[in-house]
Amino acid sequence: EDGELILERQYRHGLGVVSTEICAGVVEDGELPLHAAQRELEEETGYTGGEWEEIMTIAPNPGVMDNLCHCFYARGVKKTNNQHLDATEDIEVFLCSKEKVKEMLLRGDFIQALMVAPLWKYFTLQKDDNKR
């Protein structure tokens, strides 16, 4: 709501590093992608509400996988709860200015393509909104 983006840090075993990320998760059977995104944001960060918009749908690896990643932008969310993490999750949540996130993108601080693509899309949409 104050112009900052919600980011997370968590250890990723595959690369053996602490990764800076945006909130993400799995759509459960029978669940709509929007509802999954809202649930994951609340569970991982404690933020709820706001206005939600799907900004892109991407295929992580269409050569060998059939899953899709639905990417949402949530505007005006508020911290209303504590984290409700799974037993295997250890997530540090922090707020970051848009300018700082853009600098982090340019430096390569985000290592997951599924995080980088929606962040660049977000900044492209912000730039387009400013032209209007």
Positions of predicted regions on the chain:
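Active-site-adjacent beta-strand/loop module that shapes the phosphate/pyrophosphate-binding cleft
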Residues: 61-81, 94
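Nudix hydrolase/Nudix homology domain
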Residues: 18, 29, 54, 63, ...
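A short coil-to-beta-strand element that immediately follows conserved catalytic motifs
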Residues: 48-55
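Conserved Nudix-box catalytic region and its N-terminal flanking loop in Nudix hydrolases
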Residues: 1-39, 77, 85-87
